[in-house]
Amino acid sequence: MRKYEIMYIIRPNLDDEARQAVVDRFNNILKENGAEITNVTDWGKRRLAYEIKKYRDGHYMILNVVSEPKAVQEFDRLARISDDIIRHIVVKEEK
């Protein structure tokens, strides 16, 4: 099992219920693939450093995860094709 930090930005024009549904959906993707989410940090809505997909703001979420690479790869694959996530990054934490 490896430790990962996942940061993703949700598009700002979603209401609270829709945003929570996106967060729950992607948390469940990780859990269904055997990942353990150790920490969830909601940074809230922040201004982006530059425009991404015509958005100037985004809702930031940061997850700390312990999992096999398979779970993170599935998260990455689905985050790439989701219209609700405008940017994401997965970083493997050093030992």
Curated annotation (Swiss-Prot):
InterPro entries: Ribosomal_bS6, Ribosomal_bS6_CS, Ribosomal_bS6_sf, Ribosomal_S6_plastid/chlpt, Transl_elong_EF1B/ribsomal_bS6. CDD domains: bS6. Pfam families: Ribosomal_S6 (PF01250). Keywords: Ribonucleoprotein, Ribosomal protein, RNA-binding, rRNA-binding. GO terms for biological process: translation. It comes from the Bacteria. GO terms for cellular component: cytoplasm; ribonucleoprotein complex; ribosome. The keyword Glycoprotein does not apply. GO terms for molecular function: small ribosomal subunit rRNA binding; structural constituent of ribosome. Belongs to the bacterial ribosomal protein bS6 family. PANTHER family: MITOCHONDRIAL 28S RIBOSOMAL PROTEIN S6, SMALL RIBOSOMAL SUBUNIT PROTEIN BS6M. Binds together with bS18 to 16S ribosomal RNA. This is Small ribosomal subunit protein bS6. The lineage of its organism: Bacteria, Bacillati, Bacillota, Bacilli, Bacillales.
